[in-house]
């Protein structure tokens, strides 16, 4: 980080999934406080789509506001524990057509209660099909410009594929939200036997 003069860190605070039909934090962060000193920290919370399923949200008028409050409270607990001052929070959710309204409502409830600038991850398909997928009510989005293919035994690059990316970028200039871009800074190996991963 020092050699690359990285000043801003997006740190995954936790995932949120279901346990006993209730949203709970999964794998909370363990931060090396020395490595973040003097850096701008942006907490990132990955929200599994399952927490926005209609069987949880429909007919439960307090589910969304309670979820937003608990997410904010959990983020602030981590900030206090590590003595971090943050001004922005990012939510990462690959929302679907059936969960977008609940997810967007949670973002609005979060913004009403907490003073943070709010960003959200945006996938390529959410840019191309924005009329269907909707645009999250946040200050800006971060376009995830990676994980473009399936992991296969063929050797095709599943992290970045230019031809795949180009199929999704035709409507990028029309996207009504300011976008930053997240580029891949990783690699992985795929082990296969008999054509199977």
Locate each region found by the language model:
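N-terminal substrate-binding region of glycoside hydrolase catalytic domains
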Residues: 1-28, 142, 147, 156-157
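Flexible, charged surface loops at secondary-structure boundaries
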Residues: 2-5, 35-37, 135-136, 173-175
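Hydrophobic beta-strand segments of well-ordered beta-sheets in folded domains
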Residues: 6-11, 40-43, 89, 140-141, ...
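Short loop/turn segments at strand-loop or loop-helix junctions that form parts
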Residues: 12-14, 43-50, 143-147, 183-185
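Chitinase-like catalytic core of GlcNAc-active glycosidases
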Residues: 16-140
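Substrate-binding surface in catalytic domains of secreted glycosidases
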Residues: 108-195
